[in-house]
């Protein structure tokens, strides 16, 4: 199984377009300690030829250009991307669908709830129905979006996308609006969970034994954005677990047998983005890799 992390940042990327927090300021200045990062997306293939795109970032055209595996290869119109799978309806996971509208056949997969958030917005009708097939997938149903690649979706604690929030919103609920994926090929297993509000025993059982885990790395501490002075929301309010602390992802997953552990979907205010920081060193010392754009895994 071949895995390419196309985009390793959370919504807005690094640096964010209007941000001068300490981390974004380093990125704007071209400081080598902070790599620029595009928004959350990965691609997975069983053979290096046919690819499944997981989440369609607003930066998808840039990501395709930066990764030769994703380039058109033949004829006037072609793409090695055979299917797209959404893990939620967040803007940074669906906006890139609008870029994939140029008459290229593929199948869009998601749970009924996630797909409804796309179907209910007519702007996505630019993906012509006769070209882009939309396929609903039930939780715990195993399917093959690309031949040789088996995928199972499961609910994880999360929340509805920001643009669908209302007074009834519940943070940490386990529904079909935020899902994790277990991807299998050639006897290897990859767990991809870019959004998760908390770690449950069921989640730990789901991912136990995986050869690699790509997990929500939005915030180091719950109050990262507040500390940076650029926002008032906590990680929990955004539906994202913190890395540190007794209930954080590092401690909560420490006793789970997993091969490689990689943080993805990293917010611009997370100090682990600074490569020589004590925060980065601490995370790495506990067995985690901080993803960057273009990172590849061969399982």
From Swiss-Prot:
Pfam families: Lactamase_B_2
HAMAP family per the UniProt record, alphabetical: PQQ_syn_PqqB
Protein name: Coenzyme PQQ synthesis protein B
Upper classification of the organism: Bacteria, Pseudomonadati, Pseudomonadota, Alphaproteobacteria, Hyphomicrobiales
Family: Belongs to the PqqB family.
Organism superkingdom: Bacteria
Pathway of action: Cofactor biosynthesis; pyrroloquinoline quinone biosynthesis
Role of this protein: May be involved in the transport of PQQ or its precursor to the periplasm.
NCBIfam families, per the entry: PQQ_syn_pqqB
InterPro entries: Metallo-B-lactamas, PQQ_synth_PqqB, RibonucZ/Hydroxyglut_hydro
GO biological process terms on file: pyrroloquinoline quinone biosynthetic process
UniProt KW keywords: PQQ biosynthesis, Transport
Keyword Electron transport: no
């Amino acid at each position: 199984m071949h895995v390419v992390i196309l985009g390793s940042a959370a919504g807005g990327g690094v640096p964010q377009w209007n941000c001068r927090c300490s981390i974004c300021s380093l990125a704007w200045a071209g400081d080598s300690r902070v790599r620029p990062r595009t928004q959350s997306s990965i691609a997975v293939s069983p053979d290096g030829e046919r690819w499944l795109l997981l989440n369609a970032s607003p930066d998808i055209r840039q990501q395709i250009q930066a990764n030769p595996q994703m380039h058109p290869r033949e004829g006037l119109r072609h793409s090695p991307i055979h299917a797209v799978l959404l893990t939620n309806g967040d803007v940074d996971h669906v906006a890139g669908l609008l870029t994939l509208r140029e008459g290229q056949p593929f199948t869009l997969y998601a749970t009924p709830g996630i797909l409804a958030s796309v179907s209910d917005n007519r702007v996505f009708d630019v993906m012509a129905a006769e070209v882009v097939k939309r396929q609903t997938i039930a939780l715990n149903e195993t399917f093959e979006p690309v031949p040789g690649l088996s995928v199972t979706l499961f609910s994880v604690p999360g929340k509805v996308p920001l643009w669908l929030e209302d007074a009834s919103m519940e943070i940490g609920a386990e529904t079909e609006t935020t899902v994790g994926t277990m991807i299998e090929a050639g006897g290897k297993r990859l767990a991809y969970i870019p959004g998760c509000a908390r770690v449950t025993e069921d989640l730990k059982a789901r991912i136990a034994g995986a050869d690699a885990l790509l997990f929500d790395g939005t915030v180091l501490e719950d109050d990262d954005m507040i500390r940076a002075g650029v926002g008032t929301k906590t990680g929990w309010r955004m539906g994202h677990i913190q890395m540190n602390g007794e209930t954080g992802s590092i401690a909560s997953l420490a006793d789970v047998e997993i091969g490689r552990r990689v943080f993805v979907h990293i917010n611009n205010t997370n100090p682990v983005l600074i490569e020589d920081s004590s925060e980065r060193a601490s995370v790495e010392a506990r067995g985690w890799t901080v993803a960057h754009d273009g990172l590849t895994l061969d399982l």
